[in-house]
Design a protein with these regions (language model features):
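Acidic anion/phosphate-binding donor-loop and adjacent secondary structure
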Residues: 129, 157-161, 166-168, 175-194, ...
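Short His-centered aromatic/hydrophobic patch
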Residues: 96-102, 120
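N-terminal strand-loop element at the rim of the active site
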Residues: 5-13, 21-74, 155-158, 170-171, ...
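Conserved acidic donor-binding segment of nucleotide-sugar-dependent glycosyltransferases
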Residues: 317-319, 323-330, 339-345
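A conserved mid-protein helix/loop that constitutes part of the nucleotide-sugar donor-binding site
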Residues: 13-21, 201, 208-224, 243, ...
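Active-site donor-binding acidic/aromatic loop of nucleotide-activated sugar
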Residues: 240-245, 258-267, 273, 323-324
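A short, well-ordered alpha-helix in the C-terminal region of glycosyltransferases
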Residues: 332, 339, 346-360, 367-373
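Short hydrophobic beta-strand element within catalytic cores of glycosyltransferases
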Residues: 303-306, 316
């Protein structure tokens, strides 16, 4: 089966990392069409996945865009849609991996008469999307998609509650390669030395710096933890979110935590950095559709504490394979951090359980088999290694 994958992003986020794993088995007869140039294209090329930037300029539509802004963007979309329709005629299936890709993919599906699959990586709610964009996404999916793949039960539930057709949606979790998350003790020791964290109890936070990701929650919790607890933030702010970064530094200064917080910015050595942490914290204040960071921490053999909402509830069972806390409650988070610091053996057992469960439940080979089975209706060919 020949698949045309579509994605709007030039930068690799969770949806894009997921797409790499899905596209790999089909790479000898697939193309990933991007709407923006950037580092994601380089990452696809490193994985030997054919890629082409299809748009000449960035499409200016945000999740919270109004109807007028959305209609204005249609003029920008016309050349892109024309190109995608022409390209799609050479493929058996259009696979839209993001919401803007759904808009383009739906129209391309109509004109090229190719089936459309939409991979839903978002919780479609008014909390994250304008009413206009919500309506567009649901109507296009209902009208044009043969299949919607949701990355969690939480994403599926929100889709159906927003008016999505429950008969076309299936849940498939993200897949991971467990071996990527294995780091030697000597490498961990060296990394902690390089970071100046040898004697610290390190709580890692891995995500872009944004208010809803809740870095400020961890900083507030840190103030209530023993002095050997240090927070390590890995990730950058996107354009327009620099004010939040300034707020974080102001919060740190006001609480006198300058010597207990490190910002590393964007890093590519995530598994190694996670392995160098004693605990990984997920502190999103809004429901997370899936939570790749949670699974990655588990695969690294590190205990994880997650905000009890959205997809995280499907990944973490409290005190079985991790810890759950109420979103936006620093006091609860501080209690869990202190517990992990004091109850070392119990915490190690929980982390070991999590690693064993995650290695089986989210193995990329198993997940890709689930995807292939769903896509098999659109062609008799199976993916090659």
């Amino acid at each position: 089966m020949k698949i045309l994958f579509l994605d709007q992003s030039g930068k690799p986020g969770g949806a894009e990392l997921c797409l790499i794993d899905i596209a790999k088995p089909y790479r000898d007869r697939a193309l990933v069409g991007l709407f923006t140039d950037g580092s994601f294209k380089n990452l696809l090329q490193q994985n030997n996945i054919p890629v082409e930037v299809l748009a000449n300029k960035t499409i200016q539509v945000r999740k919270e865009s109004s109807l007028a802004q959305g209609l204005k963007s249609l003029g920008q979309l016309a050349p892109l849609i024309t190109k995608v329709v022409k390209t799609a005629s050479e493929y058996d299936l259009i696979y839209a991996n993001t919401q803007k890709a759904l808009v383009v993919g739906a129209l391309a599906s109509l004109f090229s008469r190719r089936p459309l699959v939409y991979h839903l990586h978002d919780i479609l709610s008014k909390e994250h999307f304008s009413q206009t964009n919500l309506r567009i996404a649901i109507n296009l999916a209902n009208r044009f998609a043969s299949l919607v793949i949701a990355n969690s039960q939480a994403s599926k539930t929100a889709f159906v509650q927003a008016g999505g057709n429950p008969n076309i949606i299936k849940v498939v979790y993200n897949g991971f390669e467990p071996k990527i998350y294995q780091t030697s003790k000597s490498d961990i020791k060296q990394l902690k030395q390089n970071l100046g964290l040898e004697r610290q109890f390190v709580v890692g936070h891995f995500s872009r710096l944004a208010p809803w990701k809740g870095q400020h929650i961890l900083i507030a919790a840190l103030a209530e933890c023993p002095p050997q607890v240090t927070a390590l933030f890995v990730g950058d702010a996107l354009f327009g979110e620099q004010d939040y970064v300034q707020q974080l530094h102001q919060q740190i200064a006001e609480m006198g935590l300058e010597n207990r917080v490190k910002f590393l910015g964007f890093r590519s050595d995530i598994p190694q950095l996670m392995a160098a942490c004693e605990l990984v914290a997920h502190t999103s204040t809004s429901p997370e559709p899936f939570g790749r960071v949670i699974v990655e921490a588990m695969l690294c053999g590190r205990p994880v504490v997650a905000a009890k909402a959205g997809g995280a509830i499907e990944l973490v069972e409290h005190r079985i394979n991790g810890f759950l806390v109420t979103p936006g409650k620093p006091q609860e988070l501080a209690q869990v951090i202190t517990t992990c610091l004091q109850e070392i053996e119990t915490t190690a057992t929980i982390a070991h359980n999590a690693q064993a469960i995650a290695s089986q439940r989210f193995d990329v080979t198993t997940i890709n088999q689930q995807i292939a089975q769903l896509l098999s209706k659109y062609g008799s060919d199976k993916p090659t290694g």
